[in-house]
Amino acid sequence: MKKRKNIIAAVILLMCCVAASLKAEVRYATTSVTDIPFDMPRVALPDIPANTVCITDFGAVGDGGSLCTEAFAKAMQTLAAKGGGRLVVPAGIWLTGPIQFENCTELHLERGALLLFTSDFDAYPNVSTVYEGNTANKKMAPLWAYRKHDIAITGDGAVDAQGERWRPSKQGKFTANQWKELTSGQGIAHKGVWYPDAKQDDEAGKEGKPDFRRVLQRPVLLEFAECQRVLLQDVTLSNSPAWNTHPLKCEDVTIDHVTIRNPWYAQNGDGLDLESCNRCIIKNSTFDVGDDAICIKSGKDKEGRSWKMPCQNVIIEGCTVLHGHGGFVIGSEMSSGARNIYVYNCLFNGTDTGLRMKSTRGRGGVVEKIYVDKINMVNIAGEAFTFSLYYANKPVAGKQDGDTSSADAVPPVTEETPCFRDLHISNITCQGARRAVYFNGLPEMPLSDVVLENSLFVCDEGADMHYAKNITFKNVKIQQKRGERITMADVKNFKEK
């Protein structure tokens, strides 16, 4: 009897060990970065079961005209009933409404597959989400997940969200011929802005009033909110109604060899907005967009501060940015803060600005421990490195491009005061920019503790700094065409070595 009990105990122990070993087989994302300047935790990859279904099994037709929304919903529900798995989309044009992910599911787009999301406004239910840092009532994102775990989009296929059927377009972004061509088709021009649709449900529609619902409620292309273990790999995500890709309050996010595209004129056409996420690797991806390309965010103002969720533990490596308002950007919605961010070995080619950090009074939040290394920049329209705490607000008098009006009173430091400190920028090579460096902090909260080293800037103008302290330049070469190499006002403890 005693021997039998021992055998049973041994079997139970063995089963526990096997279960523990299976549970421990977590796969992690890899990075080529070896000297990460902070304690970076590993980033877990999704665990997708081996079950596989094909979208054609559910009646979908890839002819670009047959609506496949119901087929995608049935496929996801079928996988969910099996505990998860992979949904394969073969070559073809698959017209569909929004796709909602279930736990442990992977959407795999084979080469030649195009997900074409319908422009039917009513195909997208309204959802409570976050946009520009605050709670908002918007249309559901075409690619949508809320509080799911282990989800992925993979494959060499592409996604087109038909953003031109949602976005307004400002006349100032177009040449005369481009504007004429845009406004000659469907849509309506109203006060220097082209809108994709006129309002049809009242008399105002007959007078050419735009349908502002479509504009105000337009969704981002991809929103994964409060999800764990997310993977985007190899796919092309393009033509979003608003922002392109928006992981929100997620953990363990990997974006690898992804192409993110929006038209250069796309209103609010950001590429990647990583908001209040933890443990992320963004690598070997390409961005060509209409607004900021790779952007770190963490909520806006009082609501954002209440999250207490900084965007943190992020590696961005081996990425290329073409058109975009900024190559790597922090802000302006950063009220929960950001820290432990490492940007390494990237190329910015033809971007409006290279490194862009922005906020304003009222935001609050602390941004610190930001590391940027080995960035090559070519043909930058504005600044190679710009920092301003006057985003969308008037700067202190005389501190930006000739403003000579009287200065406002300096407010006290409160939780609403944004703080940027402990920035380390190294090995920057910029061949062509309007200005090398522009710093504009707040009188009550200067930009502080910045090290810029081993860098070369070939530009029209040099460095211009205001309201900053503890700034160190080490082996920084600035070859400007005009003006002084460095100009400063209200800068304390500047050192050059």
Model-derived regions: residue spans:
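Bacterial Sec-dependent N-terminal signal peptides
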Residues: M1-R27
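Extracellular/periplasmic carbohydrate-active domains that bind, remodel
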Residues: A20-K497
